[in-house]
Amino acid sequence: MGPAIVQSLGGMKYILVVVNDFTRYTWVVILKDNSEVVDKMIHLCKKLQVEKNILIARIKSDHGREFENSKLISFCNDQGTKQEFFAPKTPQQNGVVERKNKVIQKMARVMLNNKSMPKSFWGEAINTACHTLNKVYFHLATKKTQYELWRGKKSVVKYFRVFCSDCYTLRDQENLENFDAKSDKGFVLG
C-alpha cells in the first residue's frame, strides 16, 4: 500500500502487508521506499521459517515490480517456494490482502482521528491496528483468534491500552528536588 501522502515518523511512505492464508495472521512492515520490499519480504520469510521450522510453500502477490524481480524469484527457487501472481488489474483475486489493507487502514484512521493526532503517526497506528486484529479477531471456521491459530496459545489482551491514551514515565535517574514532578506526561502509541 502506498505511497502515503503524509510521511510517517522516520520518513516512511509504504506498507507491506503479508497474510498467512490459513490463519489470516497478518504482518505489516512500514517502508521508506518500494525498493525495500524484496529485502523485507525475504527477511520475513526467513524469520518465519526459522520460527515455525517450516518451509513456505507459496507466495501469492500482484504483478508489482517489487514482487516480480530476479532477487525474489531466485530466493523462491532456492527455498522451493512457488511464486504465484494474480491477473493484472484484478485486486478482487487478492481479496484477503486487499480486505486486510482496508480494515487496517480504517482502524488506523479511527485511532488517529479519535485523539486528533497528527497524520504523521499513521505508521504507529497501522502497527497497532494489525497487532489488535491478530489478537482479537476470530477466525470463523475455528472460533479462535488469528494469534491463537498462528502461535498455538491463547492471546492475552489485558495489557491493551487505548491508542494515544495518557501515560507517565518515571524520572527516577534525575536529580529531583523535593517538590519536582517525578514523572513526565506522554501518550501510548500501541
Where are the model-predicted features located?
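Anionic group-binding determinants
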Residues: 1-190
